[in-house]
Amino acid sequence: MAADHYVYVLSCADETLYTGYTTNVERRVAEHDAGEGAKYTRGRTPVELVHTERFDSKSAAMQREHEIKSLSRAKKERLVADETG
């Protein structure tokens, strides 16, 4: 069985947004919260998961991660609001 691939957005303690890729969202968020995630999120804990998208392939997920990372903060906030609103 092939693994699912996810793109996720975290809200950091300093009110910034971080976008990443993983095959296990729960584990990855826990790593970020423990200071074991990306250098960017270290010192910006706690983090809160605010958006996820699932993909069947790593390449599709990585492409979407790149797209989200290129968005302005306002567009990222709209993306998050669309999911939670």
Curated annotation (Swiss-Prot):
Region (Disordered): 58-85
Occurrences of domain GIY-YIG (ranges): 3-78
InterPro entries for this protein: GIY-YIG_endonuc, GIY-YIG_endonuc_sf, UPF0213_domain
Compositional bias segments (type: Basic and acidic residues): 58-70
CDD domains reported in the protein's UniProt record: GIY-YIG_UPF0213
Disulfide bonds: none
Family: Belongs to the UPF0213 family.
Protein name: UPF0213 protein NP_0776A
